[in-house]
Amino acid sequence: MIRQRTLKSIVQMTGVGLHSGRKVTLTLRPAAANTGVIYRRTDLNPPVDFPADPESVRDTMLCTALVNDDGVRISTVEHLNAALAGVGIDNVVIEVDAPEIPIMDGSASPFVYLLQSAGIEELNTAKKFIRIKKPVRIEDGDKWAEIRPYNGFRLDFTIDFNHPAIESDDQKLVFEFSSQSFIKDISRARTFGFMRDIEYLQSQNLCLGGSFDCAIVLDDYRILNEDGLRFENEFVTHKVLDAVGDLYMCGHSILGELSAYKSGHALNNQLLRAVLADQEAWEWTTIEDEKDSPVAFMQPGMVLA
């Protein structure tokens, strides 16, 4: 059977918070079967836990943020969450000593490296998948996102940016999930933003950690980063990365196909909530024979670059 996974050892990394611009320390700890993904603020006394749950996502303005009833929050969880989904980690406690996960280079790649450094431990409990049984669609103006039954996990994503630096041919991506393809083709795509927006946010004491080191930055005509893009379709690829992270906020791998047009964190979260609220739209399932699995996770001990 495909088994649940956690980490073999405790790992830690330090980075800068996108919003505060301050140093943030992130610690990942192994967890027992059926613990799920738990985010924990350790700078508070007592510490505050946020289980991965679409209902905990209450702010999607500039990132995906978990907020509890007392207004305590952890921001910018989506790239780490995408890395957990990509590597197939079911059980982990994520400790952070700040109100946000460090932004690192603006992609999921540093988190994938961290998870691989910790090592993967398979647990003697079946991995629980959410299998989509019928289509569910959310619309917002001309934006939409839909998930439908599919024997695997596939994302068909289209963006629509009218910008000289973003070619029309590079605004659509179909991604068939496997750990190997996620790490190789998706995880390195960075977040992006416009210089005018960053300057405005920083004037409002926001996005203080934003820089060329953690994002693709554009003006009205071109990409301002000296090194340019990591690959031609990096913009839409990052949107796929975000969607992988946003959908994994249910704490389980999904068997289904997401199609989306101009979707972002808010629409992704609304879709996930709508699916889980409809008892006829999904079911729990396990995969007894790994040879029959429609999704391929990396083997424990294997390092993919």
Swiss-Prot record:
Identify which residues the record assigns to the active site: 265 (proton donor)
Keyword terms of this UniProt record = Hydrolase, Lipid A biosynthesis, Lipid biosynthesis, Lipid metabolism, Metal-binding, Zinc
Which cofactors are required for activity? Answer: Zn(2+)
The GO cellular component terms are: membrane
SUPFAM superfamilies recorded? Ribosomal protein S5 domain 2-like
Query: Which Enzyme Commission numbers does its entry carry?
Result: 3.5.1.108
Task: Using the UniProt record, name the top-level EC class of this enzyme in a single word.
Answer: hydrolase
Protein's pathway: Glycolipid biosynthesis; lipid IV(A) biosynthesis; lipid IV(A) from (3R)-3-hydroxytetradecanoyl-[acyl-carrier-protein] and UDP-N-acetyl-alpha-D-glucosamine: step 2/6
Biological processes annotated in GO: lipid A biosynthetic process
Drop me one GO molecular function for this one: metal ion binding
* Gene3D superfamilies the UniProt entry points to: lpxc deacetylase, domain 1, lpxc deacetylase, domain 2
Domain of life, source organism: Bacteria
Q: Which Pfam families match?
A: LpxC (PF03331)
Q: What HAMAP family does this protein map onto?
A: LpxC
Q: What is the annotated role of this protein in its UniProt record?
A: Catalyzes the hydrolysis of UDP-3-O-myristoyl-N-acetylglucosamine to form UDP-3-O-myristoylglucosamine and acetate, the committed step in lipid A biosynthesis.
Family of this protein: Belongs to the LpxC family.
Record protein name field = UDP-3-O-acyl-N-acetylglucosamine deacetylase
The protein's organism comes out as Aliivibrio salmonicida (strain LFI1238) (Vibrio salmonicida (strain LFI1238))
